[in-house]
A protein has these predicted regions:
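Charge-rich, low-complexity N-terminal segments
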Residues: 1-82
Length: 82
């Protein structure tokens, strides 16, 4: 099964990326995911279910530890491939 994750971390800082946002970006970019798109107001990535779920676990743990007060995410099934 293939999944797509969309997420944001808060609090926002329009002047520079806060530590929790940098950590979240590093987690997603280091994961074995496809179609990673990192932006200032939202991020998306796609991949196999195991890879996405592992990345989401790390994303939540590490961004909260780095100061995020809120993490909003959505996970969608986008296909049956690996």
């Amino acid at each position: 099964m293939r999944l797509k994750v969309e997420f944001t971390t808060e609090p926002f800082d329009l002047d520079e990326a806060p530590a929790h946002a940098v950590v979240a970006r590093e987690v997603i970019q280091a994961a074995e995911l496809d179609a990673v798109d990192v932006g200032p107001f939202g991020n998306t990535a796609e991949g196999g279910a195991d890879a996405v779920l592992t990345a989401v676990d790390a994303l939540l743990r590490k961004s909260l530890a780095a100061g995020a007060t809120r993490v909003s995410l959505q996970v969608n099934v986008i296909g049956e491939g690996s």
